[in-house]
Regions:
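Solvent-exposed, amphipathic alpha-helical segments
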Residues: 21, 25-33, 78-86, 118-122, ...
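Amphipathic alpha-helical packing segments from all-alpha helical-bundle domains
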Residues: 77-81, 108-118, 126-157, 167-170, ...
Length: 212
């Protein structure tokens, strides 16, 4: 193989390794919740790179945060496949329970903590977010769209009203964040009981929309 091609392959391999190291460092830093953790230059330093390397790999800080979100989305999709593979003849309540349990445990993961801390540092107003961080905003929008599609697919064969599925899919992430927060803070409440109650309520709501 010509030396120029060998050099090109080596350079590409080093670039990919640098990119992976920066994304891993970003998740670790963001998940820590430390003051100043939402800093691309600090993350670059922790990964042994420079701000110039961030710009080369991702363009700017917007591209960097978008890449972090995309990276965690890939791992999230792999996790969600655990419950989307529920047998097609599984009853409705079992499917709701699988979704709730998966999120309840998954929201305590390093990836989830990283995303929560990143979102907390971004503009709350969608117009500001889209103006200042257009690629990050697009990735966040993609998350929501993918989640809705996943939930619709989970109940598609049961004849459930799609609008009710949409409402339930919109509710569940926020509800699970609340329960996870209670668990992290320490609570006298029985959180297993809370999950069962939520599961029963949502399953009943969806069941009522099925053809009789």
């Amino acid at each position: 193989m010509p030396s120029a091609q060998v050099q090109q392959r080596r350079s590409k391999k080093r670039g990919l390794a640098t990119r992976e190291a920066m994304l891993d460092a970003a998740v670790r830093s963001l998940a820590s919740g430390d003051p100043g953790s939402v800093s691309a230059s600090r993350i670059a330093k922790e990964s042994g790179a420079t701000w110039g390397a961030v710009q080369y790999q991702f363009g700017d800080v917007d591209g960097f945060w978008a890449a972090v979100l995309h990276r965690t989305a890939e791992r999230r999709d792999a996790t969600l496949s655990a419950w989307t593979s529920v047998e097609s003849d599984a009853p409705l309540r079992e499917r709701v329970s699988a979704i709730i349990d998966t999120l309840y445990h998954g929201l305590a993961s390093q990836d989830s903590r990283a995303i929560e801390n990143l979102r907390a540092a971004l503009p709350r107003d969608h117009r500001d977010l889209e103006r200042l961080y257009p690629r990050t905003a697009a990735e966040l929008f993609s998350w929501g769209k993918s989640w809705q599609q996943t939930c619709q697919s989970a109940f598609a064969d049961l004849g459930v009203d799609p609008q009710r599925v949409r409402e339930v899919a919109t509710l569940i992430p926020g509800a699970m964040r609340g329960l996870v927060s209670e668990r992290q803070l320490g609570s006298y409440a029985d959180l297993d009981e809370a999950r069962r109650g939520l599961t029963n309520a949502l399953a009943t709501y969806l069941e009522q929309s099925r053809p009789t």
